[in-house]
């Protein structure tokens, strides 16, 4: 059992939790993930390590409420326990040797991008961060990114905060200003990553993306997280989650990601209705 030490609501649909998990924290690195079960009968869901504190023995997770399991997780409070918390899993993000990097995060993907930007900053790299959201109410981790970035661009679709536009608009602007990046790291919605990669390919900039498809066992056995990368089948849980963005078949990944969306929406609505009845 893993105790929740801190809970913070970042926006109406995104929550941060610090979880007591010393063995996981001891080995965690940016880019890796954990798989948890809220209770004994719960489903297994993957969540990327948003931060870690080896001395305190804690792992920070940030999740968006999108289905019944994340709804159930969000109902837990400080002092409550998560039944299973397995990790760290996956291959950590490559950060060594990079001198100038653009880190691009979209929505809740910023939770994955932040620890990478933080490590790059700590290694002495020049970090240009671009974070994008639909509107000001959905902005998360702005202060955290500001503390580890030499340049920070905040974009919103409607212009209610930061600059109006897409993350690709900001990235193109920085490239056209003459910034030569060793690498671009893009993490967020599949469509966003697809178009970031399309842009960087035109300029010949190496680009890494973090792929977070459906996962079940986290060992590559189930095949649920399979992707096509460079014409070959890869598994996000053991081969990733980071991949060369110019080799990822995004159209296939987008199609696969929508397979269970209707079912997830239905379960989310059922859970919400059940919770309302319990309250009543």
PLM features per residue range, with description:
Residues 1-78:
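Ferredoxin-reductase
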Residues 6, 51, 154-156, 209, ...:
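Structural signal for conserved beta-strand scaffold positions within catalytic alpha/beta enzyme cores
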Residues 36, 84-85, 227:
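A generic structural signal for residues embedded in beta-strands
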Residues 42-51, 89-99, 237:
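Short, Lys/Arg- and Gly-enriched loop/turn segments at beta-strand edges
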Residues 71-216:
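FNR/FR-type flavoprotein reductase catalytic core
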Residues 112, 190, 213-242, 270-275:
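Local cysteine-cluster metal-coordination motifs and their immediate loop/turn environment
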Residues 235-239, 243-280:
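Short Fe-S-cluster ligation motifs
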């Amino acid at each position: 059992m893993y105790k929740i030490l801190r809970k913070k609501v970042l926006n109406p649909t995104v929550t941060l939790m610090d979880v007591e998990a010393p063995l996981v924290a001891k080995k965690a690195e940016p880019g890796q993930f954990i798989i948890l079960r809220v209770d004994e009968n719960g489903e297994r869901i993957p969540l990327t390590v948003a931060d870690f504190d080896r001395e305190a023995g804690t792992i920070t997770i940030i999740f968006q409420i999108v289905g019944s399991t994340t709804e159930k997780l969000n109902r837990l409070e400080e002092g409550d326990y998560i039944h299973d918390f397995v990790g760290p899993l996956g291959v950590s993000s490559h950060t060594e040797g990079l001198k100038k990097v653009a880190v691009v995060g979209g929505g809740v993907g910023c939770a994955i991008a932040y620890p990478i930007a933080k490590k790059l900053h700590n290694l002495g790299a020049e970090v240009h961060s671009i974070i994008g959201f639909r509107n000001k109410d959905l902005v998360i981790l702005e202060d955290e990114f500001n503390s580890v970035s030499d340049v920070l661009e905040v974009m919103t679709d409607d212009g209610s905060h930061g600059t109006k536009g897409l993350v690709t608009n900001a990235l193109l602007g920085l490239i056209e200003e003459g910034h030569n990046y060793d690498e671009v790291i893009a993490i967020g919605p599949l469509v966003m990553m697809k178009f970031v990669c399309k842009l960087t390919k035109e300029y010949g900039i190496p680009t890494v993306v973090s792929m977070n498809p459906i996962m079940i066992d986290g060992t590559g056995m189930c095949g649920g997280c399979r992707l096509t990368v460079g014409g070959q089948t890869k598994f996000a849980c053991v081969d990733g989650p980071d991949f060369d963005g110019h080799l990822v078949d995004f159209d296939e990944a987008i199609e696969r990601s929508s397979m269970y969306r209707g079912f997830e929406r239905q379960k989310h609505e059922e859970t919400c209705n059940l919770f309302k009845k319990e309250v009543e």
